């Protein structure tokens, strides 16, 4: 039985279509090179294929999270060596944001390890958002479940994007997370949309899900109304001490397939090649860009896990003739050969 998600309205988005799990699964079954080719054509119809949006992600409150997400080293339930830290001071965050901008990042993402902010936290968070926004950067926050009115506070402070991943398919979700439900995720996404914020929503591949469950994950994202402006696709980073430390290895072609299917089903969304790049070969990353990925996290750390080194990223982008996205090169008409 398929789960139908109708998140924001009772009428289909005029520029979207309903994607059944079966239909998405059929895309996954497409011969690999044909699937990548189809995704590349879709990508070129909506984006400049040479431009890659660079984001930097910083943990502004680390560790001690009460949730039991099976992939997360910041959970207080697991012994992973992550030390709990309080919410950082505004000045420290601004300094990191300045460095990120100087290195080419156009978006600065901030994450806090907790179930969700308390009303007493919102004042400081909005102060942080305003300070980063004043640097001329796009701002993105991943602060967990939001109470009523909080999304409006963040919007007023200048937050551009709110990240809140669904993580995996509705069917696989309970195998990964038990302390909050899939519907809790959707509730916060609804509050974010209602406040007028852009949505960044994706998940993690390689958490022992099967292909049908991966198809259910992509279908759930593609059927959000409207579709997320940004879709981060993470490859599981296995961390000792977490329940998923011994998850089965995912074949690299399956990850590339997921990128391609995300691009085809969400043609106007940024598809971000997110966590896990540190362990990816240059060839695998190149295939992901060919399949429609057009955003990466740039910097040596993602919250508390490692990321590809900046020098390595610069070298790879030069090899592939890619360039950081700017307002000028964001949309260039490239007619695909047919």
Curated annotation (Swiss-Prot):
Q: What InterPro entries does UniProt report for this protein, alphabetically?
A: Aldolase_TIM, BATS_dom, Biotin_synth/BioAB, Biotin_synthase, Elp3/MiaA/NifB-like_rSAM, rSAM
Q: Which residues form a coiled coil?
A: none
Keyword field contains 4Fe-4S:
yes
| Residues the record lists as binding [4Fe-4S] cluster | 65, 69, 72
UniProt domain Radical SAM core: residue ranges: 50-277
Q: Example GO biological process term?
A: biotin biosynthetic process
Q: Which residues bind [2Fe-2S] cluster?
A: 109, 140, 200, 272
Q: How is the cofactor bound?
A: Binds 1 [4Fe-4S] cluster. The cluster is coordinated with 3 cysteines and an exchangeable S-adenosyl-L-methionine.
Enzyme Commission code: 2.8.1.6
Catalysed reactions listed for this entry: (4R,5S)-dethiobiotin + (sulfur carrier)-SH + 2 reduced [2Fe-2S]-[ferredoxin] + 2 S-adenosyl-L-methionine = (sulfur carrier)-H + biotin + 2 5'-deoxyadenosine + 2 L-methionine + 2 oxidized [2Fe-2S]-[ferredoxin]
The domain of life for this entry's organism is Bacteria
Kindly give the Gene3D superfamilies that the UniProt entry links to this protein: Aldolase class I
Record-linked Pfam families: BATS (PF06968), Radical_SAM (PF04055)
Q: Name one GO molecular function term.
A: 2 iron, 2 sulfur cluster binding
Database matches in PROSITE patterns: RADICAL_SAM
Q: Which cofactor does it need?
A: [4Fe-4S] cluster; [2Fe-2S] cluster
Self-association and partners: Homodimer.
Family, similarity comment = Belongs to the radical SAM superfamily. Biotin synthase family.
Q: Which NCBIfam families match?
A: bioB
Q: What is this protein called?
A: Biotin synthase
From which organism does this entry originate?
Actinobacillus succinogenes (strain ATCC 55618 / DSM 22257 / CCUG 43843 / 130Z)
């Amino acid at each position: 039985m398929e789960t139908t998600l109708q998140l924001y309205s009772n009428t289909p988005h005029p520029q979207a279509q309903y994607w059944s799990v079966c239909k998405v699964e059929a895309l996954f079954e497409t011969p690999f090179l044909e699937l990548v080719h189809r995704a590349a054509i879709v990508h070129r119809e909506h984006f400049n294929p040479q431009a890659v949006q660079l984001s930097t992600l910083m943990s502004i409150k680390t560790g001690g999270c009460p949730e039991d997400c099976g992939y997360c080293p910041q959970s207080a339930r697991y012994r992973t060596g992550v030390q709990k830290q309080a919410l950082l001071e505004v000045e420290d965050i601004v300094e990191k944001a300045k460095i990120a901008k100087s290195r080419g990042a156009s978006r600065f993402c901030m994450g806090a390890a907790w179930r969700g902010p308390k009303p007493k936290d919102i004042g400081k968070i909005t102060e942080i958002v305003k300070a980063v926004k004043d640097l001329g950067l796009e701002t993105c926050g991943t602060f967990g479940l939001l109470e009523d009115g909080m999304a409006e506070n963040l919007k007023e402070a200048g937050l551009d994007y709110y990240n809140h991943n669904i993580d995996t398919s509705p069917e696989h979700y309970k195998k990964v997370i038990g302390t909050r439900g899939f519907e809790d995720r959707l509730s916060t996404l609804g509050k974010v949309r209602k406040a007028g914020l852009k949505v960044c929503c994706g998940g993690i591949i390689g958490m022992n899900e099967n292909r049908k469950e991966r198809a259910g994950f992509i279908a759930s994202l593609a059927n959000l109304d409207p579709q997320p402006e940004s879709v981060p696709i993470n490859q599981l980073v296995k961390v000792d001490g977490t329940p998923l430390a011994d998850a089965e290895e995912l074949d690299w072609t399956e990850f590339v397939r997921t990128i391609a299917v995300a691009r085809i089903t969400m043609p106007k969304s940024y598809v971000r090649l997110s966590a896990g790049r540190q362990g990816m070969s240059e060839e695998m990353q190149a295939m992901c860009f060919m399949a429609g990925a057009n955003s990466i996290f740039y910097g040596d750390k993602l919250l508390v896990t490692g990321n590809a080194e900046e020098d390595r990223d610069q070298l790879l982008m030069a090899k592939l003739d890619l360039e950081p996205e700017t307002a000028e090169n964001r949309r260039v008409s490239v007619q695909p050969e047919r």
